[in-house]
Every structure is written in C-alpha cells, then in structure tokens.
C-alpha cells in the first residue's frame, strides 16, 4: 500500500485493516499517518504503536523467562522440565504438582506465575500448554500422606511423582525453590521460580488449575464447606464451616485449625525431619501424564481423572 492510498481510506477502514486484521504498516505509511489531518487516523497510528510496543515488551519478558532453559539448551540438554506445586497452605484437600517439558519455540503470550493470573487466563493457558507441550503431568499427595509425612515432605513427594510421570524423561529439572532428594535427575532449584522460569510457570498453571477443578468436585461430595469458593484455604467462610460442621474426611488433621475443630491437642513435629524409610514412594499413586504420541504411558496407581493428552512438537 502506498502512503497516498491512506488518505482515501476512512478511519473505519484504517482500523479494520491495521488493528482488526493486524496488517503490516510500512515506514512510509506510518509517516503519512503521523501527518494525517484526521484525528481518528492519528489515533489509529497511536494504537498501532502502542500494540507494537506491548508486543516487543512481551517478547522481551518471555525471553527473560527462558534464560535458565536457554543456558541448559545451549549446553546440550534437550529436554528441560519445570515442576511446581499448588495447595501447600490449605486446610483441606491434596497437594497437587504439575510438571512439563516445553518445545524451544513455545512462547505462550501472557504466561506468568499462576497466582498472578485470573481463573479464565489460567484455564486458557493450561489448555494451550497441554496442547503444545512435549509432555506434561500432574500428580498429588493425598491428605493421609500430608498428615503422615507433614506438608513439606508431602509437597516433595507430589513434585517427584509429577516429574517421574513425564514421558520422555527430562534431562534436567527446574524446581520452584526446592531440591527433590528422591529424584535421581540433574535439577536446579530456583527461588521464586514460577516468576523467573517459563517452564516452572507453565507447571504452576497445570498444578493450580488441576487442583481447583478437583476441589470443585470435592465440594459436591462434601457440601456446606464452600470448597468450590476457597479451594480449602483458611478463609472466614471455611473457618465458619469448620465450626458449624466439624471436619470432613478431606481435612488435614495435622493442621492446627482442623485439630482445634476436632478438639485434638496440637502436634509437635519437626517440619524438615527426614521422612520414614517406608514413606517416600515417589513413583506411586496420584499421577497422570500428558504424553507425546508414540510414547508409552506411565503406570501409576489411583490416577486423577484423565485429562487431554499433550501433543508433541519439535524441540
């Protein structure tokens, strides 16, 4: 398109071509819009430049989120996994971990730590991640395991199970904040990893959306507690329900507010003490995987309800 053609287009036509259809604007046409006497035409240019700036900023942000992955890729590690968990603080329900391996060219717009996203964005991104990941998995540690091991070690168990459910297996694992002692794979713990690594952020979204969906299902089994609203977290609504109804089977008996509701004495336990020899079974229950076509699924007991498997993409 020539600059003189712009003068013959209405403002509505300019909007439709350059904003709605996102057609490229040449430097000559950009200069012509700068001096266009119509305020509406200049506004179209302002919006074009604003979107261009936002796209560049998003591209830079995503490149920044891939610096850990990039170092590993450049070092010859092809399959880099990220893993994160959701549900450490709630008074009820399991802790759920998500893990995934992403293609090198995958740049999901808007991805961030799951806590920074609203429900609709998390769900949109979760479906996109599952559709584009090399492989993905979610796993959980049940309430009984949380009460037996404590929440910290149960979180490690869920994280380990999620990574071990990935097929193909990763060559390196990026973990949010912690190291997984039962995982015999190279790994890098990253403080605030869900805000600093794209792959961990993707895993956090898988964990959060899976757990939220599960708590909605548990709300139907245990009505009156409001699990579909607070997801088991310690809110005023949850405390009122505990006082009114008492604890239900998915409440964590090792957590003090639940023990108070049951009239039990406080527990005195060392949070970071090594788990019993028989307690850690990382490859055990509670894992499902999204698997690249052609790979054998992981054999795990008591899986979560089946989810849509991931599609393979080149790395």
Curated annotation (Swiss-Prot):
Cofactor binding, per record: Manganese or magnesium. Binds 1 divalent metal ion per monomer in the absence of substrate. May bind a second metal ion after substrate binding.
Location of the protein in the cell: Cytoplasm
Record GO terms (molecular function): manganese ion binding; RNA binding; RNA-DNA hybrid ribonuclease activity
Region (Disordered): 273-292
Cofactors, names only: Mn(2+); Mg(2+)
Keyword annotations from UniProtKB, A to Z: Cytoplasm, Endonuclease, Hydrolase, Manganese, Metal-binding, Nuclease
Annotated GO CC locations: cytoplasm; ribonuclease H2 complex
EC number, as in UniProt: 3.1.26.4
Main location: cytoplasm
Catalysed reactions listed for this entry: Endonucleolytic cleavage to 5'-phosphomonoester
Low complexity: compositionally biased ranges: 278-292
RNase H type-2 domain residues: 78-267
Pfam families, sorted: RNase_HII
Enzyme kind, highest EC tier: hydrolase
BP-aspect Gene Ontology terms: DNA replication, removal of RNA primer; mismatch repair
Binding site for a divalent metal cation: 84-85, 176
Function, in words: Endonuclease that specifically degrades the RNA of RNA-DNA hybrids.
Family affiliation: Belongs to the RNase HII family.
Name the record gives this protein: Ribonuclease HII
Organism of this sequence: Anaeromyxobacter sp. (strain Fw109-5)
């Amino acid at each position: 398109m020539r600059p003189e053609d712009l003068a013959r287009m209405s403002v509505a036509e300019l909007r439709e071509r350059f904003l709605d259809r996102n057609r490229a604007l040449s430097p000559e046409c950009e200069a012509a819009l700068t001096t266009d006497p119509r305020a509406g035409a200049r506004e179209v240019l302002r919006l074009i430049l604003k979107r261009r700036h936002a796209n560049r900023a998003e591209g830079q942000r995503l490149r920044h989120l891939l610096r850990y992955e990039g170092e590993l890729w450049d070092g010859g590690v092809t399959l880099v996994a990220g893993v994160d968990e959701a549900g450490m603080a709630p008074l009820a329900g399991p802790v759920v971990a998500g893990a995934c391996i992403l293609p090198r060219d995958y740049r999901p717009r808007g991805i961030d730590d799951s806590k920074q996203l609203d429900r609709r964005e998390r769900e949109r991104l979760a479906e996109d991640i599952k559709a584009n990941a090399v492989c993905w998995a979610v796993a959980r540690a049940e309430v009984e395991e949380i009460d037996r091991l404590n929440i910290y070690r149960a979180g490690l168990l869920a994280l380990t199970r999620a990574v071990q459910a990935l097929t193909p297996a990763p060559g390196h694992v990026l973990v949010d904040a912690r190291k997984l002692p039962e995982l015999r794979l190279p790994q890098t713990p990253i403080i605030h990893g869900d805000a600093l690594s794209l792959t961990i952020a993707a895993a956090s979204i898988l964990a959060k959306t899976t757990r939220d969906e599960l708590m909605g299902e548990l709300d139907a089994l245990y009505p009156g507690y409001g699990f579909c609203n607070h997801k088991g977290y310690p809110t005023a609504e949850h405390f009122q329900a505990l006082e009114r109804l008492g604890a239900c089977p998915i409440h964590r008996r090792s957590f003090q507010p639940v023990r108070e509701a049951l009239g039990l004495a406080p527990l005195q336990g060392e949070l970071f003490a090594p788990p019993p020899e028989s307690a850690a079974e990382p490859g055990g229950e509670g894992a499902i995987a999204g698997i690249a076509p052609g790979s054998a699924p992981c054999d795990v007991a008591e899986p979560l309800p089946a989810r849509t498997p991931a599609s393979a993409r080149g790395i």
